[in-house]
Amino acid sequence: MANLSQPSEFVLLGFSSFGELQALLYGPFLMLYLLAFMGNTIIIVMVIADTHLHTPMYFFLGNFSLLEILVTMTAVPRMLSDLLVPHKVITFTGCMVQFYFHFSLGSTSFLILTDMALDRFVAICHPLRYGTLMSRAMCVQLAGAAWAAPFLAMVPTVLSRAHLDYCHGDVINHFFCDNEPLLQLSCSDTRLLEFWDFLMALTFVLSSFLVTLISYGYIVTTVLRIPSASSCQKAFSTCGSHLTLVFIGYSSTIFLYVRPGKAHSVQVRKVVALVTSVLTPFLNPFILTFCNQTVKTVLQGQMQRLKGLCKAQ
């Protein structure tokens, strides 16, 4: 006999309040999604193909671009298809899987940002020991831990959601299976789960943010002591793109998920989720290109090479 407190499927309202105008959102969102996918793919290909980018900094950058693609894929394709159909239904299992991968990949991206901050800290504050401290093996270990820890930690989190009693309906007022809308449908006592969520946010978001801030505190102090203006400018330009990614990534997540006792309107959650799922992955390749001189130089070189091949044919 089926468990009536666990629906077989959920209805994702998405942008149903727009009515027939939903179809007009499809084109802009699809374009942003495709540009985000292509932009981050170009970054990954550049990191793999160009030997100038075979360094720890760009190894982590390639990981981050891959994460941007994967995080976007957990929610946006589903959102795009729902814009064109009247019945926006996701199975219970599909909802739990989407929840698991969305938050696991999102947490991993914050840890990779922290790895990037540690790399810049060692490069600028301890340049003579950089080759030893940031060896290939160490980079693989740091990246491996950043990927493994959230995926393991999210297992009990998603299992707890799967065993809740959902007797307040089956309609999720969002375009993906977000945490708070799911808990609002449950008639179980979720106080312990909410406390666990807060601990997870402290572990993967606030702690990594704190490590990043401390690292950049040391970096700024060290850079300001550099007598050469050109070296100082180079150091800041190298870190500028990373700092921009840190600000965009952490601000929206801390706003939504870290504050205890939080309560945000449905529309606010949807807008912030759109920023993190669509707009941020779209902007990141441009931030990395315009703020990072090395990436810009490599990209220009690849474009010149491609132009030369086209002329030769």
UniProtKB/Swiss-Prot annotation:
GO MF terms, alphabetically ordered: G protein-coupled receptor activity; olfactory receptor activity
Cytoplasmic face residues: 45-52, 119-137, 216-235, 291-313
InterPro entries in the cross-refs: GPCR_Rhodpsn, GPCR_Rhodpsn_7TM, Olfact_rcpt, Olfact_rcpt_6C-like
Keyword terms, alphabetized: Cell membrane, Disulfide bond, G-protein coupled receptor, Glycoprotein, Membrane, Olfaction, Receptor, Sensory transduction, Transducer, Transmembrane, Transmembrane helix
Tree of life domain: Eukaryota
Glycosylation sites: 3
GO cellular component: plasma membrane
Chain segments annotated as transmembrane: 24-44, 53-73, 98-118, 138-158, 196-215, 236-256, 270-290
Protein name: Olfactory receptor 6V1
